[in-house]
């Protein structure tokens, strides 16, 4: 019907004596509803963590001119998406995470006004975008009173991007980070008598320049010796007992 709705046919009748009669007929083709075919999607990739992102424009073929097509979604990740004004998009307040799924699968069903339908499954590629660090841990938050330079603890940053490298800076100029270790700089010392805790902020920055700040409170432990004198030439003599005044102090003493 879509190619030609009527056909002209001439029928010729011949009797036994050879006489003939011809008559022309017009044959009309009745239009029958046909299902949509060949669902298309103009693009099939979105950036991760982009809530409500438009994937692409949906289209379909239907031999019935002027037919209206509606779309429905299903499949493994169908609930992540919706169709708005013919565009396939992530729902608002919904985003995809490359680290969780690098590809999302959605099945699109196109239904015409006569109720006939066809479906097609699309793979939506999620493009990895750099994620900022989300946390910083320190292996110990205690240091010894009287410490003159030395390592406080090892810093570790959390980041969803695997294989990421980090740099660190510290808000307190007495400290520095060397090879991931928080250290008291040479020429500096901490004393329990003047500060029992030290609060500082560590900033970690990934290779793409995204950063994260975290505040730490370091406990300064006081070491006391019961006796500080001993006789000369008395190797092995016990000088006194060591004690630390802070029951929460966790640094290792050797």
Model regions and ranges:
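Acidic, turn/loop-rich segments in luminal/extracellular domains of secretory-pathway
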Residues: 1-37, 42-53, 58-134, 139-150, ...
């Amino acid at each position: 019907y879509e190619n030609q709705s009527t056909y002209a046919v001439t029928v010729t009748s011949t009797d036994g004596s050879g006489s003939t009669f011809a008559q022309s007929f017009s044959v009309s083709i009745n239009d029958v509803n046909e299902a949509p075919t060949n669902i298309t999607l103009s693009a099939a990739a979105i950036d991760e963590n982009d809530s409500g992102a438009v994937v692409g424009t949906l289209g379909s073929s239907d031999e019935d001119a002027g037919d209206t097509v509606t779309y429905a979604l299903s499949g493994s990740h169908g609930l992540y998406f919706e169709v708005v004004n013919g565009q396939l998009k992530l729902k608002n307040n919904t985003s995809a995470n490359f680290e969780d799924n690098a590809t999302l699968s959605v099945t699109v069903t196109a239904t015409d006004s006569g109720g006939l339908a066809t479906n097609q499954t699309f793979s939506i590629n999620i493009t990895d975008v750099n994620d900022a660090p989300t946390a910083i841990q320190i292996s110990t938050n205690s240091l010894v009173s009287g410490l003159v330079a030395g390592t406080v603890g090892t810093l570790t940053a959390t980041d969803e991007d695997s294989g990421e490298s980090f740099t660190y800076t510290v808000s307190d100029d007495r400290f520095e980070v060397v090879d991931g270790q928080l250290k008291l700089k040479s020429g500096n010392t901490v004393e329990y008598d003047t500060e029992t805790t030290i609060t500082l902020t560590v900033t970690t920055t990934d290779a793409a320049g995204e950063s994260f700040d975290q505040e730490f409170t370091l406990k300064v432990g006081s070491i006391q010796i019961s006796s500080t004198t001993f006789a000369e030439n008395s190797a092995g003599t016990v000088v006194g007992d060591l004690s630390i005044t802070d029951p929460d102090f966790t640094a290792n003493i050797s």
